[in-house]
Amino acid sequence: MTKIITHLLNPLAVIIPILLAVAFLTLIERKVLGYMQLRKGPNIVGPYGLLQPLADGLKLFIKEPVRPSTSSPLLFITTPMLALTMALTLWLPLPLPHPMTNLNLGMLFILAISSLTVYSILGSGWASNLKYALIGALRAVAQTISYEVSLGLILLAMIIFAGGFTLTTFNTSQETIWLLTPGWPLAAMWYISTLAETNRAPFDLTEGESELVSGFNVEYAGGPFALFFLAEYANILLMNTLSTILFMGAMHNPITPELTSINLMIKASALSMLFLWVRASYPRFRYDQLMHLVWKNFLPITLAMILWHTSLPIFTGSLPPQT
């Protein structure tokens, strides 16, 4: 009985804070964009608009989930659930400061599951049976698959630095120096690729309002739309937490080791705020520019960096112990 309770409570203890963080990330986004455009943002519901996410969530979940008569019913309903399930599953191997499941190949697991999220987007666009939704879904799939190539190669270079696929290994390897310092070109490309991977501005071509109405989720309303929304923002938080663990020495703080989780949260929040800053500052890329960036610029540079980061430690005999 105790085991059952533990297996129920442990995932809940991770899922509920993630969903709460997602809710308030939407509020921060609206506030930040508001102040950057010289306006207030939401400030009616609750003090300083703090209850706005709760009001939004309540409104979305009590709305009738309208389904177009031409859509494929089963696929149309299952894809939003699949999207959120995948987004929450990705948090399992992250050390926050202790992972839910300490996988030997944590990085590989994250890459595999993040590749599967493509199916939820493709399924939703396909099931809607609408040209705008399908074009948005195809754009999203092409974009996600393209940028996953550069993400995977950057990860490979960082694994050579750290000496293992386990995320806790990254914390140990950054006790003396952040990997951001020796690998700053990789870190810059990683951050831009995470923007593209999560379909955020300036790479939000999947939901280009001017040409695609709203992209792959154009036919979704109420609860299913809210699930897509939660999945998108959970992925943003996940990517920034992962960036923190990989490049910014997430845990190590020799003076106050008990503040490791707060340390991680502050860094991940700062990176998330940078996402919002980028959204407020840059216009949308053209589709050919988006593809040119990853295949003609990022891919050759990343391959060159992998060769450099592999050959130099072998030449100088300074490869880290492989775990």
UniProtKB/Swiss-Prot annotation:
It catalyses: a ubiquinone + NADH + 5 H(+)(in) = a ubiquinol + NAD(+) + 4 H(+)(out). The keyword Lyase does not apply. One of its GO terms (molecular function) is NADH dehydrogenase (ubiquinone) activity. It comes from the Eukaryota. It is a multi-pass membrane protein. Pfam families: NADHdh (PF00146). Keywords: Electron transport, Membrane, Mitochondrion, Mitochondrion inner membrane, NAD, Respiratory chain, Translocase, Transmembrane, Transmembrane helix, Transport, Ubiquinone. The chain crosses the membrane at residues 8-28, 74-94, 105-125, 150-170, 176-196, 227-247, 258-278, 298-318. GO terms for biological process: aerobic respiration. GO terms for cellular component: mitochondrial inner membrane. It is found in: Mitochondrion inner membrane. Core subunit of the mitochondrial membrane respiratory chain NADH dehydrogenase (Complex I) that is believed to belong to the minimal assembly required for catalysis. Complex I functions in the transfer of electrons from NADH to the respiratory chain. The immediate electron acceptor for the enzyme is believed to be ubiquinone. HAMAP family: NDH1_NuoH. Belongs to the complex I subunit 1 family. This is NADH-ubiquinone oxidoreductase chain 1. It comes from Latimeria chalumnae (Coelacanth).
